[in-house]
Structure formats: structure tokens, C-alpha cells
Amino acid sequence: MTAEKALPLGNGKAAEEARESEAPGGGCSSGGAAPARHPRVKRDKAVHERGHWNNKVEFVLSVAGEIIGLGNVWRFPYLCYKNGGGAFLIPYVVFFICCGIPVFFLETALGQFTSEGGITCWRKVCPLFEGIGYATQVIEAHLNVYYIIILAWAIFYLSNCFTTELPWATCGHEWNTENCVEFQKLNVSNYSHVSLQNATSPVMEFWEHRVLAISDGIEHIGNLRWELALCLLAAWTICYFCIWKGTKSTGKVVYVTATFPYIMLLILLIRGVTLPGASEGIKFYLYPDLSRLSDPQVWVDAGTQIFFSYAICLGCLTALGSYNNYNNNCYRDCIMLCCLNSGTSFVAGFAIFSVLGFMAYEQGVPIAEVAESGPGLAFIAYPKAVTMMPLSPLWATLFFMMLIFLGLDSQFVCVESLVTAVVDMYPKVFRRGYRRELLILALSVISYFLGLVMLTEGGMYIFQLFDSYAASGMCLLFVAIFECICIGWVYGSNRFYDNIEDMIGYRPPSLIKWCWMIMTPGICAGIFIFFLIKYKPLKYNNIYTYPAWGYGIGWLMALSSMLCIPLWICITVWKTEGTLPEKLQKLTTPSTDLKMRGKLGVSPRMVTVNDCDAKLKSDGTIAAITEKETHF
């Protein structure tokens, strides 16, 4: 991969250098000689090029790997069943059109236009809202610490699958209690009503006693689970080597990590729909209950699922888009990827609920008693269903391999985008030698040690705090509101449409522009307010209540990202010289080196005779594209 050298066009000194380069062999000579090199290029000879994707497939697979993750398998199907089956698709499609696609496209196009990571892209389009970039990276830093814990659990389960009998299929192990009952072998006449009430399944005891060794509460952190610590180390090692060479390594790894889960999902789908009772499970999954649409919580669940599953407001899409060629048709890519993501979620529901229907059929209980979401589905419900199948170790192996690959590319793309943001802020520091690789190593080591606290006996309580507060839907909605305000009103939706037209050759439908300006921020603000009004303190398993300081930690993690935006606005306005209108004028003016490089603009990579003639003003300076379209 190579990246072309750039000669930015601007006023003042930049214009002088451009005119001085018109010597023989310069960029604007009439002889058609090679373009001039910017003097800085020679001084920074040791600075590595930023790089690009080798081809479109690498970009598409990287984005697909990031957005298609565990939430598609363990969250969407359960939400669909819980919120009216097929009726849930109505609010889901509304949010898909009004929030999912517009914000997804906004972030991807912004990265492609600026060729910058998740922080510097906002600095270039509107310095006043650079805090958006910091907010996204704080959320991403939280995700990098806790999301990979799920991979550690999955690796531990996978390591226990290579046996003739799965260890969570039977009682009698050292971690089982006297209340352990194998329900598939249950003879009700041998148990009293009281003993059945206290009975627990071997799969539940394996999860709570063997894997988590869970304590009584967050107050009792307990000992480190060293086996899980080794699994976490393995996960971080794999993650590091997937991204240590940037797009050169990531672009190759995603050919496997983004496609393999589809093979596993197809196999599990075929197996699931052929099981007895599968049809009942699918019916519960899709049977429409239109009366549920009157419940506001159904609409909130649909909106938050869109934000969770599309990886928006994390800076990932901006970072991945920044490695695209300038003229890549990012609009077409975004529409295709959004449809692929939602389609995968829908199909995954058949694979999951067919198996849950089978489990309910085998146990003779309603599906409502076996349906789970989140870790409960991945590590309790589905493993329990697998024990009822012939060749159960094989199906368990395939399932946990699918989980690992689904989570792995989501994890390393998150780390890659955080690294991209840092490197783009300090390119002369980190694009030399092996400094970028050392930065990735440092972030991985720090995140690993921070994650160890979630692998203690009380670690599950901390994990739930991260999941419910640090990367909650409330934080994502808050960031989305400001993203839309910045692009739709401050930078200007029409100007951004000009930038997009310059990149892809045409203007997308006006609906997306109106979503940026009105619909998306309005909907997000409504859901955000609903979150605050209906807020209920987190309870683990709906039983354990956290101490006050536990909720305090959760809210600190949530506010650590959301406060970045208003704090940055206040600090920059205070530090900028001039009157308030002058300050706002400066802070809402895009960077002078932010240029359109296609047919509507001038390429900063190569300056030709025609370009120089077209852009030179009467006073000899080169025109800068800094006209404002602020809707204040």
C-alpha cells in the first residue's frame, strides 16, 4: 500500500510556496513535469505514509466485521420476541431509515472526506465540536476494556468442548452443589416441591461456580480467576497481531474473521430448523402482536438496538472510512452494509429461536421460560440446548467458535480506530519506526490489566456496570445528537452534500440530509429524555442491588464521555481570543487544508497547470474553501 504525497492549497505562505514551485520540474510548470514535493516532505522523510485499503473488499469486510457482532446473535432476536415479534420490525425499520443509515453514512463519509481519525476529523470540520471526537474515543476505550471479557469467557468454554461429554451437561463435578439436578433425567416423583424450587441446572452451576466463581456482591471482589486471565491474555495476543501492521494486517485478517461466522451461522441455522419443536420457537420469534406498538419501551428498544448494532458514535466508522480512496462510493457501501447487518440479525433469530423452541419442547415448558438475551443466552440457554443434541461437543464447538470470531473483529477494529485517532493527532511522533506498533502494545497491555478486575470473583458485577453505563445507549444517543447538529447545522448539510458529491459523483437522496438536520437529532433527544425519566438503578439478575458507590462508579463512567462535548465547547470558547461572535466565527470555520479533491475541487495530491490557473485569485493568492454555511 502506498499513499500519495500531498501539497495542500491555501492562502498566504502556502500560495507562495505553490508559485515558487513553478520552476522547471515544478508542479505548475507548462512542461508537464512531475509534481513538486512539499518542502516538509523532505524534512519528515522518516515519517511513514498513512496508508489506504488495498481494495474495496478490505474496507467492506472490516466494517462488516465491526458492526456484525455478538449483539446480532444475542440481543436482536430476544428484543424481537419480547417486543411483539414481527410487529417489532415496524419501529426497527423506522429507526433503521431515520437514524441508522443517516448516522452510519455521516461518520463513514466524514472519515473518507477528511482522511482523519475519530478526533482530528471533527477538529477539521468544526473545531468547536472537537469534543465529539474525544467523547467517542472515551466510549471506545471503555469498550476495549470490557468487550473482550466476553471473548475470554468464550475461549474458556471452547477449551472445555473437546471432551466426549460436555462438563456443563451433568452434575457430580467438584463445582456442583447438592441442589444440582439434570432436568433431562429428572424423575419428579423423587423430589419434593421444596427441593424442586431450590434445584439448579448443571449448566447454570458451571457458569456461576466454575467460570465466574461469583461472589455475593461487588463489595467482595475475591481472587483472580487465573484460567480466565490466561484466556484474556490469549484474546489480547490475537487482537494485537491482527492490527499491529495497521491496514496491511487488518485488511488480510478480516477475510477470515468476517466471513467465518457466516459459515458457522448457516450450519447452526440448518441444524436448528431441523430439530423437533423448532417451528414453535420460530413462531414465538416472529408472531406479530401489534398491541405492543403502543408501548414506548418497544420504540426505545428498537432505537437503542440500531445504535448498538451499527457501531455508530464510536469513531470506528470514521477511522475505517478514512483509509478509503477519496472517490470510493461510500454511500453505496453504507446502504449495502446496513442492509447486511440488519439481515444478519434477522436470520440469526431463526438460528437461535429454533434451538430455544427445541429446548422448550424437550423440557415441556413454555418458550418464555428458556428465552434469554446477552450472556444468559450465550453461556446458559444455548449451551443447555446443545447438551440435548446428539454430538453435543461438536455443536458446542461450532457455536463458541462463531462467538469468538463475531467478537474478535469487533474488538480489534475498535482498538484499531482508537490507535488511528491517537496517531492522527500526533503523526510525527507515532509514524516513525515501530512506534505505532509500540502504541498498540501499550494500549493492549493497559487494557489487559484493567480488564483483570472483571475476572475476579466479583468481576461480573463490574462487567455489568461497564455494560449498563460506560457504553450505554444513553451515551451513544447523546453523541449522535451533537454529531447531527455539527454536520447538519454548523458545518452545513448542503456543504457536506457538496463534499459527498465531489467524492462519489452524485448527491444522495435529500431524506438523509433532512434526517441529519431534524429527524435524527429529534428522535435521539426524545429517546435520551425517555431514558432519564424511566431510569431504574441496575440490579444484577434483577435481585442484587449495588451499593451507592457502585452506582456512582457507573455514572462516572457514563459522564466521562458525555461531558467531553460541553466541556470542550466551554474551554475552547474561553481560550479563544476576541468577542463572542468572533470566537464562534473562528471555532466554526473549517480548516483551510480541508479541500474537495474530486471534480468539484482541486486535488491536494497533485497540482497541475489548469488547477493553478483556476484557483489563483487576482491578487495571486490561492482561494481557500472556508465559506461558512452555519445555520445559527
From Swiss-Prot:
Keyword tags: Cell membrane, Glycoprotein, Membrane, Neurotransmitter transport, Phosphoprotein, Symport, Transmembrane, Transmembrane helix, Transport
Catalytic activity: 4-aminobutanoate(out) + chloride(out) + 2 Na(+)(out) = 4-aminobutanoate(in) + chloride(in) + 2 Na(+)(in); taurine(out) + chloride(out) + 2 Na(+)(out) = taurine(in) + chloride(in) + 2 Na(+)(in); beta-alanine(out) + chloride(out) + 2 Na(+)(out) = beta-alanine(in) + chloride(in) + 2 Na(+)(in); hypotaurine(out) + chloride(out) + 2 Na(+)(out) = hypotaurine(in) + chloride(in) + 2 Na(+)(in)
Cytoplasmic side: 1-58, 572-632
Ways its activity is controlled: GABA transport is inhibited by SNAP-5114.
Positions on the Extracellular side per record topology: 152-225
Region (Disordered): 1-41
SUPFAM superfamilies: SNF-like
Transmembrane domains' residue ranges: 59-79, 87-106, 131-151, 226-244, 253-270, 306-323, 335-356, 389-408, 438-456, 473-493, 514-533, 553-571
Molecular function GO terms recorded: amino acid binding; gamma-aminobutyric acid:sodium:chloride symporter activity; monocarboxylic acid transmembrane transporter activity; taurine:sodium symporter activity
Chief site of localization: membrane
Family: Belongs to the sodium:neurotransmitter symporter (SNF) (TC 2.A.22) family. SLC6A11 subfamily.
Role noted for this protein: Mediates sodium- and chloride-dependent transport of gamma-aminobutyric acid (GABA). Can also mediate transport of beta-alanine and to a lower extent that of taurine and hypotaurine.
PANTHER family the record matches: SODIUM- AND CHLORIDE-DEPENDENT GABA TRANSPORTER 3 (PTHR11616:SF124), SODIUM/CHLORIDE DEPENDENT TRANSPORTER (PTHR11616)
Protein name: Sodium- and chloride-dependent GABA transporter 3
Organism (species): Homo sapiens (Human)
Gene designation per UniProt: SLC6A11
